[in-house]
From Swiss-Prot:
This is HTH-type transcriptional regulator ArcR. GO terms for biological process: regulation of DNA-templated transcription. Keywords: Activator, cAMP, cAMP-binding, Cytoplasm, DNA-binding, Nucleotide-binding, Transcription, Transcription regulation. Positively regulates the expression of the arcABDCR operon under anaerobic conditions, thus playing an essential role in arginine catabolism. May also control the expression of genes encoding proteins which are involved in anaerobic metabolism. Can bind cyclic AMP. GO terms for molecular function: cAMP binding; DNA binding. The keyword DNA-binding applies. Residues 155-228 form the HTH crp-type domain. One of its GO terms (cellular component) is cytoplasm. SUPFAM superfamilies: cAMP-binding domain-like, Winged helix' DNA-binding domain. The keyword Ribosomal protein does not apply. InterPro entries: cNMP-bd_dom, cNMP-bd_dom_sf, HTH_CRP, RmlC-like_jellyroll, WH-like_DNA-bd_sf, WH_DNA-bd_sf. Residues 188-207 bind DNA. A nucleoside 3',5'-cyclic phosphate binds at residues 40-129.
Length: 234
């Protein structure tokens, strides 16, 4: 039974490493020699995946689920990153030793592949294709950060909520033709925290959008009409 368990674990790890290889557009054979340095872990909703800088030695590949990464700067400001499956994180400090104060929490049940940050940095130095892919991913990460900040500059609360909804749809939403679906984790309280407004105000705005048939709650999921994007999204 032990042998079967180890075989199953190794097969799972190999499968996820192949998924990572596809994501960064390299042959699996490049990652295969380092399989013993990697791991696959499962996290339940609300569980902390890591808190940097105490746990900043790994890079993670989100295989399944949704996460929130809360980045704290020296002034105490909080920047939130939302991610769904098929994303590599955190990579902003991959090429320099700067410590990042970042709390990563599972918004839903999650599965992640972990590998040493030093290994990924080594692979980038040894392979130009990996470096170019990671550089593009870092730029995408910074663009997401910029879009989130731009949404927060909206003067009116309703515009801020709409732009934040659009931002979430573009980063963690699932394209369903006429609308985007945001799964499970989104709440009025989270929207009010993101927008910096009261829960009551956020709830009133969401209620208006529901009346306009632009937002629909389907059990725990949110369905957001693409018509909401017209002339407001960053």
């Amino acid at each position: 039974m032990t042998e079967n368990f180890i075989l199953g674990r190794n097969n799972k790890l190999e499968h996820e490493l192949k998924a990572l290889a596809d994501y960064i557009n390299i042959p699996y054979s490049i990652l295969q020699p380092y399989q013993s340095e990697c791991f696959v872990r499962h996290y339940t909703k609300g569980q902390v995946i890591y808190f940097s800088p105490q746990e900043s030695s790994n890079i993670y590949f989100l295989i399944e689920g949704n996460i929130i990464r809360e980045h704290y700067n020296q002034n105490g400001d909080v920047y939130r990153y939302f991610n769904k499956e098929q994303v590599l994180f955190p990579i902003s400090n991959l090429f320099h030793p700067k410590e990042v104060n970042e709390l990563c929490t599972a918004l839903t049940d999650c599965t992640v592949l972990g590998l040493p940050r030093e290994l990924m940095a080594f692979l980038c130095k040894a392979n130009d294709d990996i470096f170019l892919t990671l550089f593009a991913l870092i730029n995408d990460n910074e663009q997401q950060h910029m879009n989130y900040n731009m949404a927060l500059t909206s003067k009116f609360a309703k515009d801020r909520i709409i732009k934040l909804l659009c931002h979430l749809c573009q980063t963690v939403g699932y394209d369903q033709d006429e609308f985007y679906e945001i799964k499970q984790f989104l709440t009025i309280q989270l929207m009010s925290d993101m927008a910096g407004i009261s829960r009551e105000t956020a709830g009133h705005i969401i209620h208006e959008l529901k009346d306009e048939k632009l937002v629909v709650k389907d059990h725990k999921n949110w369905l957001v009409s693409k018509h909401l994007f017209n002339d407001v999204c960053v």
